[in-house]
């Protein structure tokens, strides 16, 4: 086993990478509130894992979506637990994200030279809210349907571009199968991919610049 490790170590310098990841100076003023960002990330990982598990059973059609969710909850082994954890971690992600934003703002973590870290954080907050909006519609029950109808109808008040924007969001003039398909694609593919990329940028900036000092 030692020879195998030495072979990889010689080529990839694994120990140097491990030392860089595990050994980082932590300022003495850091407290438990500085862990909120890590909790958001952990919640996101749980979301990805549980969401991926549910894609094996969920059917993104207006006629089968609700029934497939009921099937997950009542027939699939531990399906109720997987979906419940998905919902709980979603709430945890939103709550800790809000607290994280407040912590960064109140401690001045957005100031020079960390402006871009703040910008990527704001983008991540928008993506997180988008997760909530798109995911809320997927069970395609009364609450989900009317929530989508209201949310997608908001841009209609914008002059000139309002109506085309509503049609772009819904996939048609009215809420229906095209809307559910778009929201499902956004929720399971587009948003997770964008979030992962922006999170990576966010973390790399934090690693490069370190944790901001006290006020």
Curated annotation (Swiss-Prot):
Heme b 2 binds at residues 86, 187. Its main location: plastid. GO terms for cellular component: chloroplast thylakoid membrane. Heme c binds at residue 35. The chain crosses the membrane at residues 32-52, 90-110, 116-136, 186-206. GO terms for biological process: photosynthesis; respiratory electron transport chain. One of its GO terms (molecular function) is oxidoreductase activity. The keyword Protein biosynthesis does not apply. The keyword Amino-acid biosynthesis does not apply. The 4 large subunits of the cytochrome b6-f complex are cytochrome b6, subunit IV (17 kDa polypeptide, PetD), cytochrome f and the Rieske protein, while the 4 small subunits are PetG, PetL, PetM and PetN. The complex functions as a dimer. Belongs to the cytochrome b family. PetB subfamily. This is Cytochrome b6. It comes from Staurastrum punctulatum. The gene is petB.
């Amino acid at each position: 086993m030692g020879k195998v490790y030495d072979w990889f170590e010689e080529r990839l310098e694994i120990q140097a990478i491990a030392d860089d990841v595990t050994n980082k100076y932590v300022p003495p003023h850091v407290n438990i509130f500085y862990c909120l960002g890590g909790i958001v990330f952990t919640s996101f990982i749980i979301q990805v894992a549980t969401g991926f598990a549910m894609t094996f059973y969920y059917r993104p059609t207006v006629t089968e979506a609700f029934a497939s969710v009921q099937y997950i909850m009542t027939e699939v082994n531990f399906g109720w637990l997987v979906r419940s954890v998905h919902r709980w971690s979603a709430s945890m992600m939103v709550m800790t994200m809000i607290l994280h934003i407040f912590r960064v703002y109140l401690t001045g973590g957005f100031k020079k030279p960390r402006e871009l870290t703040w910008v990527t954080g704001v983008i991540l907050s928008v993506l997180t809210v988008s997760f909530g909006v798109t995911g809320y519609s997927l069970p395609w029950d009364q609450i989900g349907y009317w929530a989508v109808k209201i949310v997608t109808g908001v841009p209609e008040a914008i002059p000139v571009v309002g109506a085309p924007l509503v049609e772009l969001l819904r996939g048609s003039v009215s809420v229906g199968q095209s809307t559910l398909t778009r929201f499902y694609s956004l929720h399971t593919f587009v948003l997770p991919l964008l979030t992962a990329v922006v999170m990576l940028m966010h973390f790399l900036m934090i690693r490069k610049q370190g944790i901001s000092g006290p006020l």
